[in-house]
């Protein structure tokens, strides 16, 4: 195959248009062209008078070597798709256990199951079908189930999000992750669009299908099963204890992949007491900002924003702040909604979610400020959790209880005044909102950096500082404030042989794809350690 990049095509291009361009670039007749595979499709909207697509493709020709030899350097290059990892044959005395059914845990368990070692996947929450009912109960009635919510349950926090599949990592395993999603029902275009996403509605079916494959391959999936302790002999794993149906049970194993996510604070406390090494890490905190989606799309695409080939526009913004922390947007959800993301009673935090169609009236994004371990007020490894919790409790009180969220208009934040009434932008957060002053629940340095960032971002994206744009508090769970150090070669936790910290909760990922990649890597490490 040959790869061609930077192919500019109009918004209404057809396969015939693309083929004509390829034949011209390759200087070959139509009969040479056997197949064309899209590798990447992105929108170039830098010039609002000339919004167009930019493509990368892989082509198969009858005489590739002959065609390539007569082309100028840089027109095309040999290409092969990254191969899925080879799974070593391994033997385990007891089935390996994966703790947590988020992206890292699901992909770890699936990798182990495909290797024929019949893993046990445990999840403290419920299957995605039942979990959806718990989330609806929160949205409609303001009732929290501490074990089944936006954070806990099959699919992890990513199941109730935009289903965004972008990542800053360059791992060859990314293709494996995306292809696995497609094989389990995700749209095929995630393999090539520049900013792939699935949407919460489709992602639930994908997650359910992955679970079914794990079971079909001989693995077990146990829900409502919470890790309560490690069983060790010296510094080696011998098993775990779990709470299931109100009873404590033991599971014998010398291999545990720990993929508990960034919100299992109680589990982290248990592990710390048992001697698992942990350290503080920086993360970020802030709010969700909501604008009319039409405003964002017009700002990004100009007059052609209603073109049928263009989807709801997104954005990714970042500014340097005077204190050096930085303010940036994260997990932007076009046509989405702000959702309740609490997992503990009397604490409030928010997240963003979109369906696949991204057809909602509002756009939302996290607007975050970098926080450092010295902000935690204590050098205890879990001090970041305590600080997070205190801010979530302050937001809960400011919202008046019942998981109603405090909101503030952008104009009011910029002028240091409380919001008393809402403007043209109507909130999407359920079970409800309360106009407020976010200074009552966020530290001063975060407020000041948010103000600075909003003003600067308005210069990058016209309308970002719209007076009626809404800020919903608080976004505290963008990533984990804790890292579990692990050996770079074996990927095992320091001082605990057989324990593999994985994914976002362990501090080694930041999003669905990077967590999934890390889950695969830890599973491969365990397989190699037990290779025959």
Where do the model's predicted regions map?
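Residues forming the flavin
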Residues: 1-51, 57-532
């Amino acid at each position: 195959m040959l790869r061609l990049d930077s192919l500019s095509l109009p918004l209404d291009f057809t396969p015939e248009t693309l083929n004509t361009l390829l034949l011209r670039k390759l200087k070959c007749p139509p009969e040479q062209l056997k197949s064309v595979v899209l590798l990447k499709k992105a929108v170039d909207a830098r010039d609002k008078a000339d919004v167009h697509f930019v493509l990368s493709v892989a082509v198969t020709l009858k005489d590739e070597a002959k065609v390539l030899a007569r082309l100028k350097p840089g027109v095309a290059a040999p290409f092969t798709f990254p191969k899925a990892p080879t799974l070593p044959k391994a033997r385990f005395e007891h089935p390996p256990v994966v703790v947590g059914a988020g992206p890292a845990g699901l992909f770890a368990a699936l990798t182990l199951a495909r290797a024929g070692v019949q893993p046990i996947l445990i999840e403290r929450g419920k299957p995605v079908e039942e979990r959806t009912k718990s989330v609806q109960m929160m949205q409609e009635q303001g009732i929290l189930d501490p074990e089944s919510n936006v954070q806990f349950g099959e699919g992890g926090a990513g199941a109730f999000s935009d289903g965004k599949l972008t990542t800053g990592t360059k791992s060859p395993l990314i293709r494996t992750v995306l292809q696995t999603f497609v094989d389990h029902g995700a749209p095929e275009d995630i393999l090539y669009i520049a900013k792939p996403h699935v949407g919460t509605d489709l992602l639930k079916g994908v997650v359910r299908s992955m679970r079914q494959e794990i079971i079909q391959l001989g693995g077990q999936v146990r829900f409502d099963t919470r890790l309560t302790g490690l069983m060790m002999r010296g510094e080696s794993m011998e098993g775990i204890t779990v709470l299931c149906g109100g009873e404590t049970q033991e599971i014998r194993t010398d291999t545990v992949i720990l993929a508990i996510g960034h919100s299992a604070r109680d589990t982290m406390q248990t592990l710390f007491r048992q001697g698992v090494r942990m350290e503080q890490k920086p993360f970020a905190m802030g709010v969700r900002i909501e604008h009319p989606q039409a405003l964002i799309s017009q700002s990004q695409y100009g007059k052609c924003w209603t073109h049928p080939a263009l989807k709801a526009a997104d954005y990714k913004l970042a500014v340097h702040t005077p204190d050096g922390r930085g303010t940036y947007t994260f997990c932007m959800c076009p046509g989405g909604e702000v959702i309740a993301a609490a997992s503990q009673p009397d604490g409030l935090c928010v997240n963003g979610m979109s369906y696949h169609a991204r057809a909602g009236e509002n756009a939302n994004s996290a607007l975050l400020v970098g926080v450092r371990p010295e902000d935690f007020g204590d050098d205890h490894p879990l001090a970041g959790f305590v600080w997070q919790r205190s801010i979530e409790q302050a937001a809960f009180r400011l919202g008046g209880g019942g998981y109603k969220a405090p909101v503030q208009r952008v104009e009011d934040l910029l002028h240091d005044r409380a919001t008393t009434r809402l403007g043209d932008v109507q909130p999407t957060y359920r079970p409800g909102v309360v106009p407020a002053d976010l200074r009552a629940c966020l530290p001063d340095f975060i407020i000041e950096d948010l103000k600075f960032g909003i003003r600067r971002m308005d210069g990058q994206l016209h309308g970002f500082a719209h007076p009626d744009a809404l800020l919903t508090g608080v976004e505290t769970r963008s990533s984990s404030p804790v890292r579990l150090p692990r050996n770079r070669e074996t990927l095992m936790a320091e001082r605990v042989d057989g324990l593999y910290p994985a994914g976002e909760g362990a501090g080694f990922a930041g999003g669905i794809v990077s967590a999934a990649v890390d889950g695969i890597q830890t599973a491969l490490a365990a397989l190699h350690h037990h290779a025959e």
